[in-house]
Amino acid sequence: MPAAIPAFWSPRIGALEPYVPGEQPRIENLVKLNTNENPYPPSPMAVDAIQQAAASGLERYPDPTSLALREAVARRHGLQADQVFVGNGSDEVLAHAFFAFFQQAEPLLLPDVSYSFYRVYAQLYGIDCELLPVDEGLRIDVDAMVARARRGSAGLVIANPNAPTGIGLPLARIEQLLAACPERVVLVDEAYVDFGGESALSLVGKYPNLLVVQTLSKSRSLAGLRVGFACGQAHLIDALVRVKDSFNSYPLDRLALAGAVAAIEDEAWFRTTRDKIVDTREGLSLQLEDLGFEVLPSQTNFVFARHPRRDAAELAALLRERAVLVRHFKQPRIAQYLRISIGSREQCGVLVQRLQEILDRP
């Protein structure tokens, strides 16, 4: 009987290759450095706001416009509330953006090494994609993207800083992409920008084709709450609202709305924890280099590294045996790299110790 179940599926579903998230295992004393979670708890103000929101009002639907949160995001970034869209994590925001903007006659342009969910969204919505190779240093080849975009496309999507490489682009290069694609949307996914990248939010007023997507999962320690947002000119936000209200009018619950507003407003907590992560990242990069790893320059809360004499998949497996979890990707161009989330200083110390033990083995 199970073999017959796919007969009920829509044809596109059978062909889908869904995104595979990093595992969330239950291993005692695990050092978990595989999903780029923040090692520090969220703002106490956010926790208090969530607890207060849970105390009353849960029998009522939340605000379908999420106005208080959109206003908080707008205040933080010098925008207007009608330039902000919010959703149940940046993945949902990205999915709505793909549906709203990229179902065109021409292909959507993506770097060949980037967040793998982009290709899943495209496949889900029947969007044709063209993958443009990153350069030998695994940097997004802006010149190649500009040249290709000028011949026509459905738009561009890049992560900046890029994932899983951690390498960022300066704003001048983002502006080149925007200028090359004036009739289509350029989506800049800034999930990791708070750890050292240059945000394109300052360009929203200048470019009607720019959509910037961010998340509260990483730098605000709210991965368990699922809150993301997009910023762009009002006509882009209107399109996202139309998609949202055709799918789920209430994507953010009362607890998420309350916690997210408080987390955004607690600037001091954000800066303190963010600075700890950046400092730990720089120290870990040096320690990995001392162990013989090649470490790409990172502007994120992770590092991307390879060892010239050891297989990355084997290293990941040996670390897992020692209760240290990192992320390995099988994609050919990056199959010899490990993506290592920046944990606490103590967690990173355990990682380095375990790697030293593995590398010392004959």
Feature roles, as predicted:
Residues 1-60, 152:
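N-terminal "arm"/small-domain region of PLP-dependent enzymes with the aminotransferase-like
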Residues 67-107, 309:
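Phosphate-binding glycine-rich loop
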Residues 100-158:
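PLP-dependent aminotransferase-like
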Residues 136-194:
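Active-site phosphate-binding strand-loop segment of PLP-dependent enzymes
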Residues 172, 317-322, 327, 331-362:
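PLP-dependent enzyme catalytic core of the Aspartate aminotransferase-like
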Residues 209-289, 293-296:
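PLP-dependent aminotransferase class I/II
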Residues 277-278, 288-322, 338:
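Conserved PLP-binding catalytic core of the aspartate aminotransferase-like
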